């Protein structure tokens, strides 16, 4: 089975302090993103596209990786879906695409395998986690059949939706052929004029693609927004 990983690593991460890219913050003596690269390299027949932007050369020179990992420069950071679009030409037709984040390096191989298994069934598969204080996170809104109906951002959530503790990690898996088909429908009709990957959920549902969620431990995907985290 072919797996095409897409790692989003273009941001600066101003709250990290300093001038280095966020994904190069130190974790156990190595750049954060290196831990993630080591994980994806354990998958046979996997290829990885790392989407870089801010100080892209520094990111590339700071990591150790095989020829199965390539770097793609996102010249303008126009949102997560725009970043994923940069990798579309590199995707194989018979593969599963897995979107990861360079600042969430602790996701486990076993967790990714569960996500990929779900995607192979034709689902858009999201990785979610339970957050006791979910302030600021997108809430997972499930249907009566327990499928994911939509993701509601905190600022848009109703009082009852804000009580939901299952939140979106951003990590997802989907057949590459489906990703190519659905992602052009994502528009930037929002205040920031950005293309949000979370819109893929609504688009998938409209196209009769089941959206499933796999819940993982929060430590795997909580991400890092400052050096303490």
Explain the meaning of each model-derived region.
Residues 26, 106, 173, 223-224:
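Short aromatic/basic micro-patch
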Residues 1-18:
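N-terminal nucleotide-binding beta1-loop-alpha1 segment
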Residues 31-114:
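Conserved N-terminal catalytic core of the sugar/cofactor nucleotidyltransferase
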């Amino acid at each position: 089975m072919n797996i095409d990983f897409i790692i989003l690593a273009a941001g600066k991460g101003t709250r990290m302090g300093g001038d280095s890219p966020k994904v190069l913050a130190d974790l156990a003596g190595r750049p954060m993103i290196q831990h993630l690269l080591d994980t994806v390299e354990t998958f046979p027949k996997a290829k990885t596209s790392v989407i870089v932007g801010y100080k892209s050369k520094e990111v590339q020179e700071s990591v150790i990786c095989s020829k199965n990992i390539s770097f793609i420069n996102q010249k303008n950071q126009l949102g997560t879906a725009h970043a994923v679009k940069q990798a579309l030409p590199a995707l194989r037709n018979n593969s599963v695409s897995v979107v990861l984040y360079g600042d969430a390096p602790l996701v486990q191989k076993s967790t990714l395998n569960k996500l990929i298994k779900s995607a192979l069934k034709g689902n858009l598969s999201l990785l979610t986690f339970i957050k006791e204080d979910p302030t600021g996170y997108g809430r997972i809104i499930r249907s009566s059949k327990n499928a994911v109906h939509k993701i509601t951002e905190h600022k848009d959530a109703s009082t009852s939706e804000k009580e939901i503790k299952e939140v979106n990690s951003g990590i997802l898996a989907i057949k590459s052929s489906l990703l190519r088909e659905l992602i052009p429908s994502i528009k930037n009709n929002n205040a920031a004029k950005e293309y949000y990957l979370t819109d893929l959920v609504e688009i998938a549902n409209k196209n009769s693609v089941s959206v499933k969620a796999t819940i993982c431990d929060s430590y795997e995907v909580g991400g890092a927004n400052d050096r303490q985290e």
